[in-house]
Amino acid sequence: MARRRQIYEGKAKILYEGPEPGTLIQYFKDDATAFNAQKRGTINGKGVLNNRISEHVFTLLGNIGVPTHFIRRLNMREQLIRQVEIVPIEVIVRNVAAGTLSKRLGIEEGTQLPRTLIEYCYKDDALGDPLVAEEHIACFNWCSQDELHDIQDMAIRINDFMSGMFAAVGIRLVDFKLEFGRLYEGDFSRIILADEISPDGCRLWDMTTNEKLDKDRFRRDLGGEVEAYQEVARRLGLLPEGGDNAVLDLESHRKKKG
C-alpha cells in the first residue's frame, strides 16, 4: 500500500492527501487536549466515535441545504472531505451560559441566554485563540463582509437544527464551535462548513440531570469520557440500544493482538 502524504496534523485530527484533486482524508485521533493544549491526554476510542457522530450530523445538515466539506466516511477513523481554505475564525454559538462566558461575565453556569449569542475567536494556538469582534475580522480582512454574513446565517441555521435534533433525544445543546472554509470553484469561492461537529466541540448536557456528555468531562477531570461520547452516539441511533456499547476499533484491536 502506498504511503499517503500528510498535509497537516492538528490536536485531534490528521489531514492526508486525498485520492482525487481537491480532496483530503481526515483522520480522527484519540488525543484529547484542553485549555489550548495545556492539558493533554488520550480518550481511547474517541476518534472512532467522533468520526461517526460528525458524519451523522454533517449528513443531516447537508440534507437541509447546509454546504459542508464532508463527502463520505471511509472507515472507522477516516472521512473523505473537500479541500478548503480555512477561514482563521472559530465561531462559537451559545444558547446557555457555560465555560469562558460564565467566567468572563460572571453569569451562573446553566443560565439560559435571552437570545442565541455568536462569538468569534482568532485561530492562533500561540495566542490562545483570542476573542475578537466583527471589527477585528473586517480590519484584518480575515473574511469579507459577505462571507461573514454567510457564516452567521449558516451558524444560526445549524444551531436551530442541532438544538432540535439533540432535544429530541433528551440532550441540551449548551454551546458549540464551528469552522468554515472557502471552497474554490474556478475563479470564485463560497463558504462551506468544515472541520467536525462532535462532543469534542459541543457542550451537551442531559436535559433531566444536567450530566455533561462532552469534553468537559476531560477538562474538569470528571472521568467517564468514553461513556459520555458513547451515550451521545447511542441516543443519536449510532450505537445499539442496551447491550455492549463498545465501539470496535480495528486499529486498536490489532495493536492489542501484537
Curated annotation (Swiss-Prot):
Keyword ATP-binding attributed: yes
Signal sequence extent: none
Pathway involvement of the protein, from the record: Purine metabolism; IMP biosynthesis via de novo pathway; 5-amino-1-(5-phospho-D-ribosyl)imidazole-4-carboxamide from 5-amino-1-(5-phospho-D-ribosyl)imidazole-4-carboxylate: step 1/2
Enzyme Commission numbers on file: 6.3.2.6
GO biological process, any: 'de novo' IMP biosynthetic process
GO molecular function: ATP binding; phosphoribosylaminoimidazolesuccinocarboxamide synthase activity
Domain of life per record: Bacteria
Disulphide bridges, residue numbers: none
Catalytic activity: 5-amino-1-(5-phospho-D-ribosyl)imidazole-4-carboxylate + L-aspartate + ATP = (2S)-2-[5-amino-1-(5-phospho-beta-D-ribosyl)imidazole-4-carboxamido]succinate + ADP + phosphate + 2 H(+)
Keywords tagged on the record: ATP-binding, Ligase, Nucleotide-binding, Purine biosynthesis
Gene Ontology cellular-component terms listed: cytosol
Family statement drawn from the similarity comment of this UniProt entry: Belongs to the SAICAR synthetase family.
PANTHER family recorded: MULTIFUNCTIONAL PROTEIN ADE2, SI:DKEY-6E2.2
Protein's name according to its UniProt entry: Phosphoribosylaminoimidazole-succinocarboxamide synthase
Gene: purC
